[in-house]
Amino acid sequence: MSSTTAGLIFLAVLVAALVAVHVPLGDYMFRVYTTDRDLATERTIYRLIGVDARSEQTWGAYARGVLAFSSVSIIFLFVLQLVQGKLPLHLHDPATKMTPSLAWNTAVSFVTNTNWQAYSGETTQGHLVQMAGLAVQNFVSAAVGMAVAVALVRGFARRRTGELGNFWVDLVRGTLRILLPISIVGAVLLVAGGAIQNFHLHDQVVTTLGGTAQTIPGGPVASQEVIKELATNGGGFYNANSAHPFENPTAWTNWLEVFLILVIGFSLPRTFGRMVGNPKQGYAIASVMASLYLLSTGFMLWFQLQHHGTVPSAVGAAMEGVEQRFGVPDSGVFAAATTLTSTGAVDSAHDSLTSLGGMITMFNMQLGEVAPGGTGSGLYGMLVLAVITVFVAGLMVGRTPEYLGKKINPREIKLAASYFLVTPLIVLTGTAIAMALPGERAGMANSGPHGLSEVLYAFTSAANNNGSAFAGLSANTEWYNTALGLAMAFGRFLPIVLVLALAGSLARQGSTPDSAGTLPTHRPQFVGMVAGVTLIVVALTFLPMLALGPLAEGIH
């Protein structure tokens, strides 16, 4: 069987599995966020933090909860990294010194669900930091994203109220009832597939295929690997990330990791449909996500399987930076999934992708990561796009736009438009400043279009909370640590505040009955319109920069 055929089977089985779990997992998450029953563990947590689980919050109080929790998390993780040398399970001789700027960058990175890593995990962070710091944030940062998405859905579903739920309840439920159970099962499957799970502080000896001995650091890898993918975090225990055989040993575990990356994102539209009382609306949103996902994955495989250049022509594909145990097709599917979500994990070297393959990964992030996007953030990003789409459609027919019975008034469209201005402003401004500073240009391993692509990729990844990188950029400097940390923080929390403000504005409205002029938002026509608006918005915003970077490199 050729690698291309194997890759197509890999993709077909993946799609079939995602379709199979869409309804049951989506319905389960609907019950999690709508039930009035609390688990005993949850009631204990609420008592400890002084939360009344039955009280609800306005959008402002909900946003303050998100910001307060995230701020405390950043401070805790920042301090934990700086003092790890005095704590148990620390590395006695770390290869990279944890400076304040690197600790800031890493703390913001994991709290914002970005997991940008300007260091080698296995030689910089001790096991206690990995478990009590980074892995914990892998859970709760994703739970924050799901909570915000659910709050926006409540804004569409509720009528004439200022309340959107309780952030602390949504946070705890998302962590304990959704992320933790799936992670336990996934970790067992990864260990069964060959991923390691131990507490070896020092190097463990392994035998290579050539029969020689090699020493590699061990650690609690499988437990962190599963939540890294499931919660679309992406930060690896090892510098090689999911290309490392201790994290991702076989083609089977590679398939499982891609499935984990996509499963919650593609199931949340079902939750949305159930919560607004119309499952067809959820199918429409899922169809937009699926269309963009398959389109991107198809282009990625096409560009990576083209035989341009001497070496690719000789081996039949662009094999540079690709693990032979996965092959080009499987790695292409992984690369598309990890950049269409906010994951950023890699099983191949993205800096070694073909120029157009690298452009696809950047374009995926610049879409706003909505196909299916990050855990929670993909759904609320897609719903904001739906709001913009009905506004554009309303302009064409000359009537006030409506979505799910809610009028899209000037306030709502201003909030939606502002949401999609945040990330481009951060990406383009950050890239321009970096290219204007001689010292930061010196951090590029390549000159010309590919050098620009390295910097553009870094700010695109940071602002969209992805975390993957073109490895040719030396990012562990005071300037990049600070600038990318700010990009991650603003790229995460400004959109969240705007989404919650939009949810609050929608919740205060009554319901507008459908009329003959109401745009049906559950039909293929609307699916095509949302996909078209998404592609047009991104093309108009980023095409000039892409033309100077990967497109120019591809033409050359």
UniProtKB/Swiss-Prot annotation:
Domain of life: Bacteria
Topology of the protein relative to the lipid bilayer: Multi-pass membrane protein
The keyword ATP-binding belongs to this UniProt entry's keyword annotation: no
One Pfam family, short name: KdpA
Sorted UniProt keywords: Cell membrane, Ion transport, Membrane, Potassium, Potassium transport, Transmembrane, Transmembrane helix, Transport
A GO CC term attached to the entry: plasma membrane
Main location class: membrane
Compartmental location: Cell membrane
One GO MF term: potassium ion binding
UniProt xrefs under InterPro entries: KdpA
Annotated TM spans: 6-26, 65-85, 133-153, 176-196, 249-269, 283-303, 378-398, 419-439, 483-503, 526-546
Subunit structure: The system is composed of three essential subunits: KdpA, KdpB and KdpC.
Protein family: Belongs to the KdpA family.
Functional description taken from the UniProt entry: Part of the high-affinity ATP-driven potassium transport (or Kdp) system, which catalyzes the hydrolysis of ATP coupled with the electrogenic transport of potassium into the cytoplasm. This subunit binds the extracellular potassium ions and delivers the ions to the membrane domain of KdpB through an intramembrane tunnel.
Name this polypeptide is given: Potassium-transporting ATPase potassium-binding subunit
Species whose genome carries this gene: Mycolicibacterium paratuberculosis (strain ATCC BAA-968 / K-10)
Source lineage: Bacteria, Bacillati, Actinomycetota, Actinomycetes, Mycobacteriales
